[in-house]
Amino acid sequence: MGLWRAPHLPLFLLGTFWAALVPLVWLWPGLTCDPVAWHRQELVLGFAGAAMGGYLLSALPHWLKLAGGEGEGISPRGTMALVLAWVIGRLAGGACQPDGVALAGLALYPLGLALSLVLPVVRAKAWGRLPIALAPLLLLLIALRLRLASDSLTAVLGMALLVALVGGRIVPAFLLARTGDRSGRSPMPFGARLANGALALALLLHLLNAAEVWVGGMALAAALGQTLRMKHWALAPALSGHGDLMLLVLAWLWLPLGLALLGLGLTGAVALPLSTLTHALTMGLMGSMVLAVMARAWMARAPGRLVAGRATIAVFAVLQLTTLSRLALSEAGPAVVPAWACAWTLVAQHCARASLRPVPRPVFSARRGG
């Protein structure tokens, strides 16, 4: 059914289009009555939310097969319903809308996505996947805090936690698969659970209105933990010229770096404003990880591996440069918008072309040989 053959096709296309469009509010502030609020809301709930849904729904059949189920994912009609919910959220959740209308619209997509994941996971008794299936509910928490309290720190910590939960499973899994290891997914190491717990505790402390120094201290602990968990990863393939894996690892590094910068800012160890420091976790982590994962859906297939094309690597490099520029120059926000928007426009073109070609199976990894 064209665009509806696989859930990642429409959701990735919408997400990349939104990533290119939303920052333009800094060049044309009249697009909305509150550019700051709309910008931070839509890059998290619109852009990252669509990308998250595209990945999780595409991974769902694999989860169900591992649990002994039939491995059937969401139907085309289900995908259409989620896309409609996403669009309603963008229309109803505008900065100028009343809070009740906005929150009702913004809640539709996270709730629909969570139900689309949780129900089949519960039916298949794939209990190990339940935390990730429930992860979209964090988007609902972010929407509530952004809308009712103008709380951008919850959004930043919430997105970091989502990447730690989801990315912290898929990045080492892709690395291990490239080594030819077929032993299956190993349990998450205790250190990784501890690192995720520290990040979740930082978010909880903030929600409980704890002093910034306590939130910052826990963010620093989480940064250390997210760095140390990499010692269990099979990093050799990423370090030996496998471009697709290198993108994932480089994207991941923004998580401990961003948490460290955030922690230093909250504890007063650095003088940069938080509005600048948080871009390491939004532009850096969120933008890089979304691209590194979604690009796998259109990368060229070689025996046992994916090949990252020059265009994908170039766009990834542009995202790194725009993030570093934003961090180095606090007032450089509007200046980096054209580069960011152009980069995501190119990614949207890749998504559009991919929707016209056969969907590769598996979507995000190479078929194993032999």
Regions found by a protein language model. Give the residues of each.
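Hydrophobic alpha-helical transmembrane segments of multi-pass integral membrane proteins
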Residues: 1-370
